[in-house]
Amino acid sequence: MTDRNLRELLAPWVPNAPGRVLREMTLDSRTAAAGDLFVAVAGHQTDGRRYIPQAIAQGVAAVVAQAEGEAEEGEIRELHGVPVIYLHRLQERLSALAGRFYQQPLHALRLTGVTGTNGKTTTTHLLAQWAQLLGETSAVMGTVGNGVLGHIHPADNTTGSPIEVQQLLLQLQRQGATFAAMEVSSHGLVQHRVSILHFAAAVFTNLSRDHLDYHGDMAQYEAAKWRLFGELDVGQRIINADDATGRRWLQKLPQAIAVAVSGTLPPERQGDWLCAGEVRYHARGADIPFRSSWGEGIVHCQLIGEFNVSNLLLALTTLLALGYPLPALLDSASRLQSICGRMEVFHAEDRPTVLVDYAHTPDALEKALTAARLHCHGKLWCVFGCGGDRDKGKRPLMGAIAEQYADRVIITDDNPRGEAAQDIINDIKSGLLDAGRAQVISGRAEAVTSAIMQAAPADLVLVAGKGHEDYQIIGKQRLDYSDRTTVARLLGVMA
């Protein structure tokens, strides 16, 4: 297909489609313009077929709409002179349709997909960084944003629509990308957003309770994740053997690659494997010895926490499975950077190590403090607050967690919004066994400054809650503020 012609586009499904030249393809009637192809899908929240008249009024050249059943398959109608072609199970076919429209841009780059409840963002960024250190031009697609490294733009969804995915792949191809790491969400898998893609490798991080409002139960949630490994076009399959779901999947996929931080692999494995030895944690990161089907060695990294050891070893194994050489991977590992605002490490000579993290729930704060403790050789400090006009029940819980896991606690503001900052602080303090143990410094910049100035060089300071955010909401004002920038300025380093 050398141009975007409706007849050629629909040839696999509708042999008698009219020959209209198409400019662009869209699911959103609000952005439809003259010459576009409007795709009207019956979605989970709205039925795109309701907006066909609006799209036609805006000048679209043609419409492909979801048929009510097989009887309508291939039916062609006209509305105000615009052809409307009906396809059965359109949502399932949309990935293939978009792939034909954008001329299969994936053929020009190597794509890896990462799925799981936690760790998708970090693992995709590690894959992209590492591949780039070995000479690739790398891109990421996911929660933090999409684009070539160094030029990442914010994203609305973890996995975009099939059209957005193909548009992005074409854009990355034009920018010279040779390697891309994509977060693949359970929603994206159920909604067939990536069904036409070829993944050189697929990675499973872990599975825990999440998104049950959408999937209904854990069995359906697991089934959604399984689609990437059991139904789609995948080369290498890399699976976390420390996870209960991962161990079950390894039994179903004998040639899949098993990765274990625990040091214990499932018995009688047929496929390749990688297994960590005893990890040494220190203030600047971790040293991770390992054995594998490709050889053994020690990974020296700047990442914090046991969960990041797992993410890193999954990335390492994936790149080994794709043929990247072990010596080059080990030589470059120390240059891997933590993800912006995700257990991000800041350090300077003779100053405390500082972590900036997005943890803003009780569970996330507990995990962040537990991870930080592994790397702390002095006192562990925690600077945090809770958002205003949000879940008040978590405030005392987070206070109790900070008191339990940190040696020094400073309670501060975190987007107080329309609530009085002192009321939020009082709610947090109500969870403390000894309220006198916590300092209260309402201004967030002052609180971060105080912690860093008081802490000794062997101490570690966790600044939790905002992560990559660059604002503070007070009342109705959205003020410029960044924990990362504040910490970097105090330590005299780059953010």
UniProtKB/Swiss-Prot annotation:
SUPFAM superfamilies: MurD-like peptide ligases, catalytic domain (SSF53623), MurD-like peptide ligases, peptide-binding domain (SSF53244), MurE/MurF N-terminal domain (SSF63418). ATP binds at G116, T117, N118, G119, K120, T121, T122. It is an enzyme of class 6 (ligase). It is found in: Cytoplasm. Its main location: cytoplasm. A motif (Meso-diaminopimelate recognition motif) lies at residues 414-417. GO terms for biological process: cell division; cell wall organization; peptidoglycan biosynthetic process; regulation of cell shape. Pathway: Cell wall biogenesis; peptidoglycan biosynthesis. Keywords: ATP-binding, Cell cycle, Cell division, Cell shape, Cell wall biogenesis/degradation, Cytoplasm, Ligase, Magnesium, Nucleotide-binding, Peptidoglycan synthesis. UDP-N-acetyl-alpha-D-muramoyl-L-alanyl-D-glutamate binds at L27, S29, H44, Q45, T46, N157, T158, T159, S185, Q191, R193. Signal peptide: none annotated. One of its GO terms (molecular function) is ATP binding. Meso-2,6-diaminopimelate binds at R390, D414, N415, P416, R417, G465, E469. Its cofactor is Mg(2+). Pfam families: Mur_ligase, Mur_ligase_C, Mur_ligase_M. One of its GO terms (cellular component) is cytoplasm. Its EC number is 6.3.2.13. The modification N6-carboxylysine is found at K225. It catalyses: UDP-N-acetyl-alpha-D-muramoyl-L-alanyl-D-glutamate + meso-2,6-diaminopimelate + ATP = UDP-N-acetyl-alpha-D-muramoyl-L-alanyl-gamma-D-glutamyl-meso-2,6-diaminopimelate + ADP + phosphate + H(+). Carboxylation is probably crucial for Mg(2+) binding and, consequently, for the gamma-phosphate positioning of ATP. It comes from the Bacteria. Belongs to the MurCDEF family. MurE subfamily. Catalyzes the addition of meso-diaminopimelic acid to the nucleotide precursor UDP-N-acetylmuramoyl-L-alanyl-D-glutamate (UMAG) in the biosynthesis of bacterial cell-wall peptidoglycan. This is UDP-N-acetylmuramoyl-L-alanyl-D-glutamate--2,6-diaminopimelate ligase.
